[in-house]
């Protein structure tokens, strides 16, 4: 990785799969993670289906790549994005990729990029398949970026995160029953790339933990420590 304060990211949008109305929120999120130095959006701009994207490209500082589909089956924009990603990878300039899509076709690409040691962040909708979510270092749900309410059936409550915390503690496997909050968060993220405290209604892990009935916390120096509440 290059010696810089913020990771240099290549951001690749699948315009056929992600609505343009989400672009602002996505770019804000990416900017909070690193420097989105390369921003490309892929689609068939002759089809008329991407009018909303066409109207935002210059405003958002995106570079549009034309991929005209002349065959049935595999989406031409998917192929174009994959080819570009490999060219960018071999250029050796970037620390990581952000793939903006909910399409499982990019699972193999994400895996290939990670094999070369690059960080891969996926951003997509809740419909994104588990295979794509799990192959990324981190997967961010668009619904969490725009504050779109989840259907009651799929809405997660704070206490639903307790099993993830217990699993993280098992992974860490230490003798002391007090765990550093940052250590817990990293263990959860490693096991569940799509973990996001916003899914449970809280912006930070500390706020989520405070809302849990089954844990207790204490300060130790500058660290917040936590453990499972003991029975009785």
Model-assigned labels for residue ranges:
Residues 148-232:
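N-terminal regulatory modules in eukaryotic regulatory proteins
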Residues 60, 116, 135-136:
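Short, structured coil segments at secondary-structure junctions
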Residues 49-54, 124-134:
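Short, glycine/polar-rich helix-capping loops at beta-to-alpha or helix-loop-helix junctions
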Residues 12, 42, 95-102, 109, ...:
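Acidic beta-strand-to-loop metal/phosphate-binding motif
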Residues 130-143, 147:
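Contiguous mid-protein beta-loop-alpha structural module that forms a pocket-lining wall or clamp
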